[in-house]
């Protein structure tokens, strides 16, 4: 995990993106083994100290966006396909109209961040 995301959100997707870039295409929870996150309980209590919540999302999402050029939601939706049933190796994202509309939103957000932050 990257220290830049500590503490808080973004470290899991960052690790997944690193694995994706290395060619890993199987991302699956194994049987009943699960990681349960308690909805940012720790970081919410320390929010003002560690995080700045902005109109572009939390700090972890902003770091991920600046580092990879896409946000966590886009990565999970179009690359990891988190809301779908596991069917083996993942392929490159399906570049349809929804992909490009979502990508446009992400790039506009990135432009905004670079311009004003």
Residues covered by each model-derived region:
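Residues at helix-coil transition
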Residues: 1, 21, 66-69
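Short, polar/flexible loop-turn hinges at active-site or ligand-entry regions and domain interfaces
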Residues: 1-2, 50
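Positions that flank functional sites
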Residues: 34-35, 80
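Conserved active-site-proximal loop/helix segments of enzymes involved in bacterial cell-wall
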Residues: 38
């Amino acid at each position: 995990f990257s220290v830049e995301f500590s503490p808080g959100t973004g470290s899991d997707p960052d690790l997944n993106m690193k694995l994706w870039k290395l060619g890993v295409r199987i991302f699956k929870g194994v049987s009943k083994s699960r990681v349960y996150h308690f909805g940012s309980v720790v970081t919410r209590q320390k929010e003002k100290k560690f995080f700045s919540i902005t109109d572009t999302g939390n700090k972890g999402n902003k770091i991920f966006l600046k580092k990879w050029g896409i946000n966590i939601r886009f990565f999970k939706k179009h690359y990891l396909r988190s809301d779908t049933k596991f069917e083996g190796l993942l392929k490159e994202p399906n570049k349809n109209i929804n992909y490009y509309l979502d990508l446009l939103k992400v790039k506009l957000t990135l432009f905004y961040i670079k311009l004003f932050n």
